[in-house]
Amino acid sequence: MLDLSNKFGYFHINIDQKFLKELLISAARDEKPHCNAALIKYLGMKPVPNKNYCYTIYGWTNCDKTIPLEKLAKIARKTACPSTVIESKIISIKAGQHGGEVKPKFPIKIDGKLGSIVGHILGDGSIDSKFKQVFFSNTNKELLKEFANNMEEVFGIKPRIWMQRKTIAFKEKTRWERRLNSINELEEGKSCGLFYPATIGLILNEIFEQFAIGKSKKIPKFIFELNKDFKRGLIRAFFDDEGTVSIRGRHIRLFQDNKALLEVFRKLLLEFDVRAGPLKYYIKRNKKRHYFSIHAKNNFRKFYNEIGFVSTKKLMRLKELIE
């Protein structure tokens, strides 16, 4: 987290007060860091007029005041305390004093849960290009719950849940009917939107090299260097959102307008020894729609054993293809 201070110095951090006080004492080499002129100057702050102390520094350790990430990083550089220890004491983060509060579990693990979050954002989700909030929409409660559970596990926050009013696809704008208390309240056949604060979107885009900015999506090259658990979660989530399983056609098929994105997923599948066919396309609403297909029982079996689906419907169809 401290590594992000150059870009997100304005993030406000709620950190264990006792620990922060000890950190400040260590940085100032003074039992009263809020009175230490050298520390006050180093942090680019000013003392109270005609006084020899800084009320803001005092407030960080005595008045439940959040501390800007930029200031916390500067304090850390004055001490020998490892960044991992400091991050373990962080309680919550906000993008500014009034942003939505999130409670990440540091260090953020590169695992299947994070891979699934990224995969769903690349699929039926997004990170708003202007306001940076994370959004995921689906009609499948299983996928909605998976995304919500993983976000809570990684970032310690529950979503704002809205049910979408039925509209004519591609002709009418999305309209939100009402806010829900639980995904279980979603009415059959309707879509549900999960909304999360900008803090998460900013962190994810920083980690994954601006992989999702509005409708512009990509997979950074370093993904191939990450562990298989992450890749498995990434592929599964994307196939749950964008893939189909056909009993009659005897194939698994992945659709996407973004040709480059499909090429990356074809290559990622090879790491699980699943071989997909070449990219093809068809024209829909005067626009190219790209796809590739997976055939053959040995590929179906490998996909089932190594990747699978969260969607019960797709998983059952895949079982039929194997049998």
Language-model regions: role of each:
Residues 1-323:
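Internal intein/HINT superfamily modules and their associated LAGLIDADG
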